[in-house]
């Protein structure tokens, strides 16, 4: 797992799990929908992994990430995908640059089931990425054309934030 992503997750996980315990008691449920964008999706991937292995009392129903970077190596991805029992999508948008970081050349991989949206967010493709990234999806622009910050900040025609924040 990337050291920076782990450091970020390790910094917030106690607060997140404390709040999760409070909310699950308040609403009398342990069913979860987990989601994140960008760095938040990297943290959510690590949190999901922790839940799968260390918190079996929670029931993950859905896991949707938007603009996620590559979080771990092939062993991490294989372990994550093998344990996964819930609906899981890693949504990417056209030439978004973040899903191509850190580079594959450094042995980073994505967890499976990419959904790739076109430039206008009007059509999508369910990608064949069980074994490796699908070169007809987000990886089709790699490595030199995937440079769009705007695509990273706009998913499903919703502005996630602004460039430079």
Report each predicted region and the residues it spans:
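Non-catalytic, mobile gating and regulatory segments of ester bond hydrolases
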Residues: 1-35, 39-165
């Amino acid at each position: 797992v990337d050291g920076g992503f782990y450091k970020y997750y390790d910094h917030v996980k106690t607060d997140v799990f404390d709040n999760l315990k409070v909310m699950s008691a308040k609403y009398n449920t342990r069913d979860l929908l987990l989601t994140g964008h960008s760095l938040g999706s990297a943290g959510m991937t690590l949190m999901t992994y922790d839940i799968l292995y260390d918190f079996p009392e929670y029931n993950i129903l859905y896991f949707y990430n938007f603009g996620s970077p590559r979080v771990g190596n092939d062993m991490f991805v294989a372990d994550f995908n093998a344990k996964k029992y819930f609906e899981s999508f890693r949504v990417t948008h056209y030439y978004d640059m973040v899903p191509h970081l850190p580079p594959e050349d450094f042995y980073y991989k994505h967890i499976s089931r990419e959904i790739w949206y076109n430039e206008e967010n009007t059509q999508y493709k369910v990608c064949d990425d069980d074994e490796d990234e699908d070169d007809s999806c987000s990886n089709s622009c790699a490595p030199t054309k995937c440079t769009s910050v705007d695509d990273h900040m706009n998913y499903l025609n919703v502005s996630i934030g602004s460039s430079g924040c």
